Amino acid sequence: MILGIESSCDDSSIALMDIDNFELKKYKKITQENEHSKFGGVVPELAARLHTAAIPNLIEDVKEFFTSIKAVAVTNEPGLSVSLISGVSAARALSLALGIPLIGVNHLIGHIYSLFLDKNVVLPLGVLLVSGGHTMVLNIDESGYIKLIATTSDDSFGESFDKVAKMMDLGYPGGAIIEKLALSGDKNRFNFTVPLKHDKRLEYSFSGLKNQVRTQISKFESLSLQDKSDIASSFQYTAISHITDKLEKIFSEYKFKNFGAIGGGSANQVLRSNLEQICEKFGSNLMFAPLKFCSDNAAMIARAGVCKYKNKCFTKPLDMSINPRCKLDGANLYF
């Protein structure tokens, strides 16, 4: 089995996966959402302290399987430095103590494996990545080579939801809160402009939309629940229109045979519905990760670890480092 550890941001998670059939033998996740919600976002120092408390307890839960673990896979890039260190330190110690290989996993590439938790990797593949501070469209060819097609020039899809939620004192994380509030809102009440609508560049930008929302909110002395619902609905509609508007242009050029949406943002049901329409229009096979595994989790890290284990992609424990920022363009997906 492969042991996966994930601690790139504000979730501590551990997973055990069978190398041969990808069966998830054990999975547990400890979220820090309640602790960070009062601050309207993730506080790095608090995240580090909570990881330090949670990870030893998670490892204790899989102690009975130690003799069956063939390698430990851990997220070592990208993410919050203080959070990455917590997971990598634990993984390094386990590798040395158990005498098993250590595997470093790129967190964003890990999300790609969330599409294939219980099956073999399918290539070629187009990907919409909407995870935390990242919004990207990727093309992965038959060899696993990853090409970046589009990214954001400022705020990400997820960050814009978090910031709009904070503007209305709704709590953190903003994605699920805005989506739920939007259900009872009127998406046509506020006519927010879709960013870069007539710009031919394959690029995303959410800061302008965020500022449109802030300007609208400033016009109110106080916001009623209905006002908040209408703002949430109008904002969500415009943000997703921005995603799909650029995707239509990308699909026209790339003709994806398979397409997957990954990351916490891909759990949004309105976005999923829009992606279904696009993929039906262009004849692309659409894939999603199970809702439980859209957000950060160790199952996807273990799944990536299985592929890297089979390809003998190991790192010496004392040589493993963390990388808070990294590029996906030119990276490879193992299968």
From Swiss-Prot:
On the tree of life, the source organism's domain of life is Bacteria
Positions binding substrate in this chain are L129, V130, S131, G132, G133, D162, G175, N268
Keyword Lyase appears in the UniProt entry: no
GO terms for biological process, alphabetical: tRNA threonylcarbamoyladenosine modification
What InterPro entries does this protein map onto?
Answer: ATPase_NBD, Gcp-like_dom, KAE1/TsaD, Peptidase_M22_CS, TsaD
* Ranges annotated as spanning the membrane: none
User: If you read the UniProt record, what top EC class would you report for this enzyme, in one word?
Assistant: transferase
- GO molecular function terms noted in the UniProt entry: iron ion binding; N(6)-L-threonylcarbamoyladenine synthase activity
Q: Which cofactors does this gene product need?
A: Fe(2+)
UniProt entry keywords in alphabetical sequence: Acyltransferase, Cytoplasm, Iron, Metal-binding, Transferase, tRNA processing
Residues noted as binding Fe cation in the record, renumbered to the chain: H107, H111, D296
Cytoplasm in keyword set: yes
As to how many cofactors bind and how, the note says: Binds 1 Fe(2+) ion per subunit.
Instruction: Show the GO cellular component annotation of the record.
Output: cytoplasm
One Pfam family assigned to this protein is TsaD
Compartments in which it is found: Cytoplasm
Name the chemical reaction catalysed here: L-threonylcarbamoyladenylate + adenosine(37) in tRNA = N(6)-L-threonylcarbamoyladenosine(37) in tRNA + AMP + H(+)
This enzyme's EC code(s): 2.3.1.234
Read off the NCBIfam families from this record: gcp_kae1, T6A_TsaD_YgjD
| PANTHER family the record matches | TRNA N6-ADENOSINE THREONYLCARBAMOYLTRANSFERASE (PTHR11735), TRNA N6-ADENOSINE THREONYLCARBAMOYLTRANSFERASE, MITOCHONDRIAL (PTHR11735:SF6)
Question: Which family is this sequence assigned to?
Answer: Belongs to the KAE1 / TsaD family.
What is the annotated role of this protein in its UniProt record? Answer: Required for the formation of a threonylcarbamoyl group on adenosine at position 37 (t(6)A37) in tRNAs that read codons beginning with adenine. Is involved in the transfer of the threonylcarbamoyl moiety of threonylcarbamoyl-AMP (TC-AMP) to the N6 group of A37, together with TsaE and TsaB. TsaD likely plays a direct catalytic role in this reaction.
Please identify the protein, giving its name as recorded: tRNA N6-adenosine threonylcarbamoyltransferase
Q: What is the lineage of its organism?
A: Bacteria, Pseudomonadati, Campylobacterota, Epsilonproteobacteria, Campylobacterales
